[in-house]
């Protein structure tokens, strides 16, 4: 499909500050390797050498997955839409679904702007609204939107554009390069529902 997804394969580094987290990361890494996942288990000195800007005094080690990456959500959406259209799908934009049509426990279409659209397949791709739409037809979708906080720094000189996403589960924080700046995200153990 001729559209950029903004794919960056910078990898991901999960780090451990505690012995229990370090054991957990190594156990997960060993299991992942059994399934062919490319990864490297790094000790504190290897992390310091590979990422000299990072403070590592309190680390036990980490797991680097060099094949991990991130993509631009808008670009991915456009790529998927273009591919779907090429495959014969019809996309109705700015057309809120009023309800999903069911008969004998099976989905057979949707109602949009008072018009019933019959179809063989319905893809429920409504993100944080999926739970409410599923409830209308008796389908439980264990998903809800939650508050999420992040900050973006001013540009940082010498910040590598190939810095992996760094996840610190002990501190509930992640870091990633974003256009020469550092994006710092915080994830909560008990998320607050957004609505």
Language-model region placement:
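Dinucleotide-binding Rossmann-like beta1-alpha1 core, especially the glycine-rich loop
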Residues: 1-50, 172-175, 179-183
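Residue-level detector of anion-binding/catalytic polar loops
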Residues: 38, 90, 140
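FAD-binding beta-loop-beta segment adjacent to the flavin cofactor pocket
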Residues: 48-56, 102
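Helical element adjacent to the flavin cofactor pocket in flavoenzyme catalytic cores
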Residues: 58, 62-121, 125, 129
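Residue-level signal for well-ordered alpha-helical positions
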Residues: 28, 53-54, 136-137
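Short aromatic/hydrophobic contact patches that present stacked aromatics
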Residues: 12-16, 62-64, 150
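Active-site substrate-recognition segment that forms the wall
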Residues: 1-11, 99-107, 115-195
